[in-house]
Amino acid sequence: MDEQEPVHIPIEDSIDLHSFAPRDVVAVVDDYLHAAREAGFTDVRLIHGRGTGAQRAAVQRLLREHALVERYWDAPESRLGATVVRLRRPHP
């Protein structure tokens, strides 16, 4: 079996987490935050949806302790369906 080359997906200032399994969301967000900072973003939006609130809670639990996160807040226009994250600036 031939190995396929990885698909390059450009990093944008938001990620929609609806297509990821709940068990994978924390790892996906962690990887995304590292890639977003490397790409030079200061603020990013994590779209987790409203639903039961479980995914939002899991995401915000990670953000509370994450070394790259300066602060985060509920995106005002999303009615609790998205979280905005301010990333720490890299040290020179």
Regions found by a protein language model. Give the residues of each.
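Long, charged, low-complexity intrinsically disordered regions
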Residues: 1-92
